[in-house]
Swiss-Prot record:
Top-level taxonomy: Bacteria, Bacillati, Bacillota, Clostridia, Thermoanaerobacterales
Alphabetized GO MF terms: orotidine-5'-phosphate decarboxylase activity
Biological processes, Gene Ontology terms: 'de novo' pyrimidine nucleobase biosynthetic process; 'de novo' UMP biosynthetic process
Alphabetical keyword list: Decarboxylase, Lyase, Pyrimidine biosynthesis
Gene3D superfamilies (alphabetical): Aldolase class I
Gene behind the chain: pyrF
UniProt cross-references to SMART domains, sorted A to Z: OMPdecase
Sections of the chain in a coiled coil: none
Protein name: Orotidine 5'-phosphate decarboxylase
InterPro entries attached to this UniProt entry: Aldolase_TIM (IPR013785), OMPdecase_type-2 (IPR011995), OMPdeCOase_dom (IPR001754), RibuloseP-bd_barrel (IPR011060)
Pathway stated in the Swiss-Prot or TrEMBL entry: Pyrimidine metabolism; UMP biosynthesis via de novo pathway; UMP from orotate: step 2/2
Enzyme class: lyase
Catalytic activity: orotidine 5'-phosphate + H(+) = UMP + CO2
Family annotation (NCBIfam families): pyrF_sub2
Length: 307
């Protein structure tokens, strides 16, 4: 079962950190672009090759210290077919090194369309889990739930997202007197009961932003069986203190994603005087180690058992 495998990988790596592979060509080190453009030309093919080579370096640097990577499809989809090739090659390479792969695709559409999206990702051996958007209703996410159970995959449904504008819809109060995100949370928690693993968590999880710690505290109680995928740490402003209530009393229950703060760590004030662009991957590894240590120390301070 997906969730059991994820928890076991977190235990083995002693880290709940997920590295987000959201590469931007304008921030890719020049030496990587030079190699890629020489191979493929200074065109869409060359750009896509550069993104893949950049990702490959990050994966090589972190595969032994994190349980999973999250690949945001938009950063590849922007370059058409060649970008998709880089997306799939990245997933394939990560899998070859034993990493779990989360495809961050945030799919949400009517049921018949959802079946095709599910076929594309959850029936693909390269991906262990995907993100989905449940805000069109329960019927629109059931194809993903059914395939997750059938193929031992996972889904993370958007519940309370990390962006500032999430309040525009998610924080509206319903006629029942609760926030929209709470209604969605209860729906996802109920559905999650159909895919509980041996550690008490479900393969049907939730996306809960690090930038809303008070809401996360409420949602941890509302969704006791759901593992949280937590974006918003680092570059978006989420801190160690903000994410503590995403975890349960045993130090599990959440994976914390960091994208820009890790993959471009060599450009940050903390690391820029230590690592050059040629050492971007080493800087990413150093940032993951630092982040993992801070999270685990935070869990210890909260009298939790560290991962």
């Amino acid at each position: 079962m997906f969730i059991d495998k994820l928890i076991e990988s977190i235990k083995a790596k002693k880290s709940p950190v997920v590295v987000g592979l959201d590469p931007r060509i304008e921030k890719t080190p020049q030496f990587i672009k030079d190699v890629a453009f020489k191979r493929k030309g200074e065109n869409i093919e060359g750009i896509s090759e550069a993104l893949y080579l950049f990702n490959k370096g990050i994966i090589d640097a972190v595969y032994d210290i994190v349980p999973a990577v999250k690949i945001q499809v938009a950063f590849y989809e922007a370059y058409g077919i060649e970008g998709f090739k880089a997306f799939f090659k990245t997933a394939e390479y990560a899998k070859s090194l034993g990493l779990m792969v989360i495809a961050d695709v945030k799919r949400g559409d009517i049921q018949e369309v959802a079946k095709m999206y599910s076929k594309a990702y959850l029936q693909n051996q390269l991906f262990d889990a995907i993100t989905v958007n449940p805000y069109m209703g329960e019927d629109t996410i059931m194809p993903y739930v059914e395939d997750a159970i059938k193929y031992n995959k996972g889904i993370f449904a958007l519940v309370k997202t990390s962006n500032k504008g999430s309040k525009d819809i998610q924080d509206i109060k319903t006629t029942k007197g609760e926030y929209v995100y709470q209604s969605v949370a209860r729906m996802i928690n109920r559905i999650s009961n159909s895919a509980i693993g041996k550690y008490g968590y479900s393969s049907i999880g939730a996306v809960v932003g690090a930038t809303y710690p008070e809401e996360a505290k409420v949602l941890r109680k509302e969704m006791p069986n759901c593992f949280f995928l937590v974006p918003g740490y680092g570059a978006q402003g989420g801190t160690v203190e903000d994410i503590m209530d995403c975890f349960d009393e045993n130090g599990f229950g959440a994976i914390i994603n960091s994208s820009r703060s890790v993959i471009y760590a060599y450009q940050t004030p903390y690391w820029k005087d230590v690592y050059s662009e040629y050492e971007y991957a080493q800087a990413a590894r150093a940032e993951v180690i630092l982040m993992t240590g801070m999270i685990n120390n935070g869990l210890v301070k909260r009298k939790y058992i560290a991962c």
